[in-house]
Amino acid sequence: MFKEYDEETLKKLQRTELEILKDFLWICEQYDLTYFSFAGTAIGALRHKGFIPWDDDIDVCLPRKDYEAFIRAAKKEFPDKYTVMNAEENENYPLTTTRWMLKGTSFREEALKDIDCELGVFLDIYPFDNVSDDEKEYKKQAWDAWFWSKILILRCIREPVILGTGFRVSAVKAACRAGHWFLKTFGFSKKK
């Protein structure tokens, strides 16, 4: 689901994200970290020699070891310029991805409009972990990741964005509200 921006706003957002990317690359070079672009960022780089024209974020990945080293280095090298936002840093943050956010900026996606944490212009950072070669174990890992990501969203967002109308959508939204209430009432935390 993409938000539509006027061209000037989108270009300003993309320029700011490129500045964040330059600092990300600097850390990766200084600390000899392996990284690569991902999803729309990789497509944009190959197909458009930059951003996909409507893309509003940059996605980068690092192997888990390098991801952990990046988080430590980012806090050391740029403590006054950026905030690391993830489940460990803020229990009101509902996503499993880490965002490296430029301080002094504000950027809130529609799906995250009701969460209780400050959000700024960011770089999405994904750690890549090894998965099992055993198909059964791999499916369990994939299901666990999917399930817990949804629980984290429900913990922080009373009514997630769900497209569509009708009885089914209304029932799912009601179930989400009930799940949110349960998780908040009984103190589910990402850190537990």
List the model feature ranges, each with a label.
Residues 25-58, 67:
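Active-site nucleotide-donor binding segment shared across nucleotidyl transfer reactions
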Residues 61-63:
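Short hydrophobic/aromatic beta-strand micro-patches
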Residues 68-72:
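Short, conserved charged micro-motifs
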Residues 2-29, 74-133, 151-192:
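Conserved catalytic core of two-metal-ion nucleotidyltransferases
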Residues 143-150:
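A contiguous, mid-domain pocket- or channel-lining segment that forms the substrate-recognition surface
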Residues 134-141:
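A short secondary-structure junction signal
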